[in-house]
């Protein structure tokens, strides 16, 4: 897990992009996470390098051509390695090579690059959670069908998929 301070420039750019984008279709929280999502992308780029592309299928293309989709959640505390990362079932068909997971503090002052996981392997190793069920690991009522994997199972680095 890598802690990254959110700079004023990162926050301004994230707010501008979020305003331009508006509410995402199928958003679990009605677009309220757009600013955090764009901050998460900036954090992932700072850690991994590459070029931000912001397509439906992926957000970042690394120098070796690896396509990365960044998944960001907001948090009130530094995440523990037992916390879970999630991929909404609606996004399970995205054409990317790796998922990268980031948490951003609710006040947008700091974020954490949590790690990565190869997309194809993620779907094999993650636990499917149906909307409305209670996640036994944390008591959370699942808002949308999703695939969960604990942070401690992530890999810190992305290895070339080419």
What would you call each of these model-derived segments?
Residues 1-66, 71-162:
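Nucleic-acid endonuclease domains
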């Amino acid at each position: 897990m890598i802690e990254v301070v959110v700079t004023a420039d990162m926050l301004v750019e994230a707010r501008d992009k979020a305003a331009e984008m508006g509410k995402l279709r199928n958003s679990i929280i009605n677009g309220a996470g757009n600013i955090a999502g764009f901050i998460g992308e900036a954090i992932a780029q700072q850690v991994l390098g590459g070029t931000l592309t912001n397509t439906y299928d992926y957000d970042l293309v690394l120098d070796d051509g690896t396509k990365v989709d960044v998944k960001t959640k907001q948090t009130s505390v530094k995440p523990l390695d037992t916390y879970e990362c999630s991929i909404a079932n609606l996004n399970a068909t995205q054409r990317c090579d790796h998922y990268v997971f980031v948490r951003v503090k609710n006040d947008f002052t700091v974020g954490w690059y949590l790690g990565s996981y190869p997309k194809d392997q993620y779907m094999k190793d993650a636990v499917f959670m149906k909307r409305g069920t209670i996640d036994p690991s944390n008591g959370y009522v699942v808002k949308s069908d999703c695939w969960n994997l604990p942070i401690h199972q992530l890999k810190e680095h992305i290895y070339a998929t080419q």
